[in-house]
């Protein structure tokens, strides 16, 4: 064989090996996404660009074996997680309810009352979105997972308290996680240390459990790198100095991806790193993580006000109406100040393709925060749509020794 043929064969073999080692990059290049979205790939630091793709291989017992592929090495550079923190909080809320159930008999559907004990706190005795017309932990969780409801998040934050949230996340192995704020512009960092009293009720007069007001005087600064974001902060039409997010919520993006995996595939994690949830808890989470807003009866959402893609970025992008519900995204998203993120477990119930994909982007060309001028629709959502389709196509064509049994989730989105 001539030398040049040997060289060509060697180069081709090396390229195949590289593609096999970096499946994610192989998928991206195969669909020319690195060309179409070249700015992201040329300046990954500028765009806080992170992608984590998890391949799922089933064995003969349908047990999932996970293999993660990173586009870039994980880092602790600060990004604003926004609503991504809702996923660990809904799991922690169910954990806490289960522990209280053993003593007081309360459940996620038990009626509750929220009182106030410090500035910026508000009371709540009724909830018109709930089937019972009363507030419940379960209904707050539904609102968070269906439409990323910030008010409901703040109530779950108050129920859990920041001390409990961070202690428990650290116990689970997420040592750099720091959740220390409501999503309420009227509450400053001091007010967020104080949480409301909660009362759980069997009826108008019978109290099952009282949770007193709480305060947390521990250090709430996060450990992220470079917590000053942007070149300025826009407020009252004026550009003010860059804001320091040292006392805001933070969770490494890798941790957020792992939390999703631990909820979808708990048995792939050691017991010490799993949420202590029941089978019913997991099914409840899967149902409302994958449901479209219009599919929910309680709470009820009109599609014209809450489009299908409200919190479905990967694969669906800017598609307001999703017609093919055989493809489901069980996910959590974040969007604020130019940051756009989605962490999802995706399934196709027809082809039985499944995978997890997490994407983080910073889309703020002016690098001014709080001016509302971000490139979500020009770059972010189209990229997440295209990458989602590229990975789904790859998974649909993949030869599998054992097909995943998706029966445990296929029935979850019947009318609720």
PLM region descriptions:
Residues 80-107, 112, 357:
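Active-site SXXK
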Residues 91-99, 146, 150, 258-265, ...:
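Short glycine/serine- and small hydrophobic-enriched flexible loop segments
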Residues 54-57, 105-125, 160-161, 182-190, ...:
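Acidic helix-start/capping segments at beta-turn-to-alpha-helix junctions
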Residues 21-37, 41-43, 235-416:
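Structured C-terminal helix/loop/strand segments within mature extracytoplasmic catalytic/sensor domains
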Residues 21-33, 46, 116, 121-124, ...:
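Active-site-adjacent helix/loop patches that line small-molecule binding or acyl-intermediate pockets
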Residues 1-25:
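Bacterial Sec-dependent N-terminal signal peptides
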Residues 31-73, 357-359:
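A short, well-structured edge-of-sheet supersecondary motif
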Residues 46-49, 74-76, 80-85, 107-109, ...:
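Extracytoplasmic
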């Amino acid at each position: 064989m001539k030398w040049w043929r040997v060289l060509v064969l060697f180069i081709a073999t090396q390229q195949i090996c590289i593609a096999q080692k970096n499946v994610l990059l192989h998928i991206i290049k195969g669909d020319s996404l690195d060309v179409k979205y070249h700015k992201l790939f040329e300046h990954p630091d500028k765009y806080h660009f992170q992608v984590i793709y998890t391949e799922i291989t089933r064995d003969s017992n349908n047990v999932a074996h996970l293999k993660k592929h990173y586009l870039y090495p994980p880092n602790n550079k600060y990004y604003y997680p926004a609503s991504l923190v809702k996923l660990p909080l809904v799991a922690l809320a169910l954990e806490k309810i289960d522990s209280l159930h053993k003593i007081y008999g309360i459940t996620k559907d038990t009626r509750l009352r929220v009182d106030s004990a410090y500035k910026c706190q508000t009371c709540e005795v009724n909830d018109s979105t709930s089937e019972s017309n009363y507030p419940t932990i379960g209904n707050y969780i539904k609102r968070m997972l269906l439409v990323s409801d910030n008010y409901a998040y703040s109530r779950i934050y108050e129920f859990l308290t920041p001390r409990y949230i961070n202690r428990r996340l650290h116990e689970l192995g997420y040592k750099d996680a720091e959740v220390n704020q409501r999503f309420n512009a009227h509450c400053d960092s001091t007010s967020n240390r104080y949480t409301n009293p909660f009362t759980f009720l069997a009826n108008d007069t019978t109290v099952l459990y009282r949770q007193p007001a709480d305060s947390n005087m521990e250090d709430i600064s996060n450990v992220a790198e470079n917590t000053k974001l942007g070149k300025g902060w826009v407020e009252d039409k004026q550009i003010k100095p860059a804001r320091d997010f040292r006392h805001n919520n933070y969770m490494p993006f890798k941790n957020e991806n792992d939390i999703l995996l631990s909820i979808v595939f708990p048995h792939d994690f050691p017991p010490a790193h799993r949420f202590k949830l029941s089978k019913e808890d997991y099914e409840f989470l899967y149902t409302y993580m994958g449901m479209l807003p219009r599919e929910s009866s309680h709470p009820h959402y009109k599609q014209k006000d809450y489009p299908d893609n409200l919190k479905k970025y990967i694969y669906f992008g800017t598609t307001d109406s999703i017609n093919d519900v055989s493809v489901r995204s069980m996910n959590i998203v974040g969007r604020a100040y130019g940051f756009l993120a989605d962490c999802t477990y995706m399934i196709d119930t027809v082809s039985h393709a499944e995978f997890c994909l997490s994407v983080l982007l910073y889309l703020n060309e002016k690098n001014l925060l709080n001016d509302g001028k971000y490139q979500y629709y020009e770059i972010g959502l189209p990229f997440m749509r295209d990458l989602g389709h590229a990975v789904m196509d790859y998974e649909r064509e993949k030869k599998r020794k054992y097909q995943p049994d998706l029966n445990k989730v296929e029935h979850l989105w019947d009318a609720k």
